[in-house]
């Protein structure tokens, strides 16, 4: 698998105001990274259904596209409405999912009540997709975690309030996300070393649990094992084992005993994770600055 530095990516094409490398070099970085890990786990732990519906690259981008289109739509302009067709066009242009896969994810989100499909008031032939309050609140919570991380660098909304953004800032952040979705897709894809986690159901959750476990043990061994990780994430023990074996093959961790009771994260894992979180912070900083100026 290609190393991080081998992945061709022009960070300047994203238009970062503060580069990921600047975040990495900052003395506050480790504390901000750990704050983001803890914050995301506080949102994800125990939410097995939601995590399986969202925490995988293609599903994540489809989910973000829906939220961004919802925030950016203008009811006076039909071309901006969040419909299934509009969402399919947006996501397929990113190259992360087919039209059928987008429709399948929308069906799942509707089945569990995270999305509803409602006729437009003036043209009942048009069916609008509408995120429910739980989906919007979860998204605001995720943004709040990253905003809290930025606050450690002195980069936060003018009000400086911790936690999730209010409804106005939330909409502005997701409106700013919409034109940046192609850049976000490229940003995710440049993290090839973390592909074993990003490409599997709940892999991102498992990554966060491993990082937290290693920090709690002074970067020593993690004795949780496959079964505990499976119970925490709502996937099978076999799924966890295969994911961790793929991560071991990629040089991200070591395991010596049966059952995954002696997982140790390799330096390559920390390097890859740090670059991932630096990218997240830089992207969030960009969205925040754009949201506050529109």
Label each PLM-derived region with a short phrase.
Residues 122-131, 259-267:
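Minor-groove-contacting beta-hairpin "wing" of winged helix-turn-helix DNA-binding domains
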Residues 217-252, 256:
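Glycine/small-residue-rich hydrophobic helix-like segments
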Residues 1-76, 80-98, 111, 121, ...:
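Intrinsic disorder/low-complexity detector
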Residues 96-111, 234-248:
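Short amphipathic alpha-helical interaction segments
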Residues 110-120, 248-258:
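A short, conserved structural fragment
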Residues 247-253, 257, 263-270, 274-276:
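Compact recognition or signaling/catalytic modules
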